[in-house]
């Protein structure tokens, strides 16, 4: 039987980290719309160029683009009978309605991650990426042994534009406007699981395992 999960919450709350941990432990597919967008941007395709402009300005990718990308990805997984975790999708009522037109709402479990905004700001603004191999570091939690260089290939680490403070604040504002009513909506459907994401990753995973049948 296919298990379908949605990890939901503000930027920087740890959705990707939790989804990766669960995917590795239980063998689920981790579907990150952010990673899909970044691979499109790296390919320098027509869609990638369009996405790059939106992402670097801290803007929001239109539902029409995101929905079609997700639809194609999920169709392949459903065909192969693979369980999956959606990370970064859905984020609007339009996206939710689109997703639940593909599968019934009750076939999903929504993990709602929450943490104070100051913790989110610290987590995001401290991220550093290797532009060559995409290795990730953090100036507070996972410093490179080579200071500002990548341990793997010695490239100078960079901060993504959407991890700069001004972009983070803009993203959080967009999130608040778009998702205030979504938590209530998921709760009314009886598919919401609330998780305290201010703790460390092992404690967050433990809480999830206590609340959700994986």
Curated annotation (Swiss-Prot):
Catalyzes the reversible transfer of the terminal phosphate group between ATP and AMP. Plays an important role in cellular energy homeostasis and in adenine nucleotide metabolism. Zn(2+) binds at residues 130, 133, 150, 153. It comes from Mycoplasmopsis pulmonis (strain UAB CTIP) (Mycoplasma pulmonis). NCBIfam families: adk. The keyword Ligase does not apply. This is Adenylate kinase. InterPro entries: Adenyl_kin_sub (IPR006259), Adenylat/UMP-CMP_kin (IPR000850), Adenylat_kinase_CS (IPR033690), Adenylate_kinase_lid-dom (IPR007862), ADK_active_lid_dom_sf (IPR036193), P-loop_NTPase (IPR027417). The lineage of its organism: Bacteria, Bacillati, Mycoplasmatota, Mycoplasmoidales, Metamycoplasmataceae. Gene3D superfamilies: P-loop containing nucleotide triphosphate hydrolases (3.40.50.300). Its EC number is 2.7.4.3. Belongs to the adenylate kinase family. It catalyses: AMP + ATP = 2 ADP. ATP binds at residues 12-17, 127, 199. Keywords: ATP-binding, Cytoplasm, Kinase, Metal-binding, Nucleotide biosynthesis, Nucleotide-binding, Transferase, Zinc. PROSITE patterns: ADENYLATE_KINASE (PS00113). Residues 126-163 are annotated as: LID. Signal peptide: none annotated. Residues 32-61 are annotated as: NMP. Monomer. It is found in: Cytoplasm. GO terms for biological process: AMP salvage. Pathway: Purine metabolism; AMP biosynthesis via salvage pathway; AMP from ADP: step 1/1. AMP binds at residues 33, 38, 59-61, 88-91, 95, 160, 171. Consists of three domains, a large central CORE domain and two small peripheral domains, NMPbind and LID, which undergo movements during catalysis. The LID domain closes over the site of phosphoryl transfer upon ATP binding. Assembling and dissambling the active center during each catalytic cycle provides an effective means to prevent ATP hydrolysis. Some bacteria have evolved a zinc-coordinating structure that stabilizes the LID domain. GO terms for molecular function: adenylate kinase activity; ATP binding; zinc ion binding.
């Amino acid at each position: 039987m296919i298990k379908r999960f949605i990890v939901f919450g503000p930027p920087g709350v740890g959705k990707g980290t939790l989804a990766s941990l669960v995917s590795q432990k239980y063998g689920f597919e981790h579907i990150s719309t952010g990673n899909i967008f970044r691979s499109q941007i790296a390919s320098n395709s027509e869609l990638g160029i369009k996405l790059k402009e939106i992402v670097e300005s801290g803007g929001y990718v239109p539902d029409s683009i995101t929905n079609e990308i997700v639809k194609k990805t999920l169709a392949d997984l459903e065909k192969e009978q693979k369980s999956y975790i959606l990370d970064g999708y859905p984020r609007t009522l339009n996206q939710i309605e689109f997703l639940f037109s593909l599968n019934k709402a009750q076939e999903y479990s929504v993990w709602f991650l929450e943490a104070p905004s100051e913790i989110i700001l610290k987590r995001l603004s401290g991220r550093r990426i290797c532009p060559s191999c995409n290795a990730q570091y953090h100036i507070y939690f996972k410093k490179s042994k080579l200071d500002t260089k990548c341990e793997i290939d010695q490239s100078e680490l960079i901060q993504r534009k959407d991890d700069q403070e001004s972009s983070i604040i803009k993203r959080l504002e967009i999130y608040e406007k778009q998702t205030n009513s979504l938590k209530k909506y998921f709760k009314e459907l009886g598919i919401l699981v609330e998780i305290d994401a201010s703790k460390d990753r092992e404690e967050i995973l433990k809480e999830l395992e206590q609340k959700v049948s994986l």
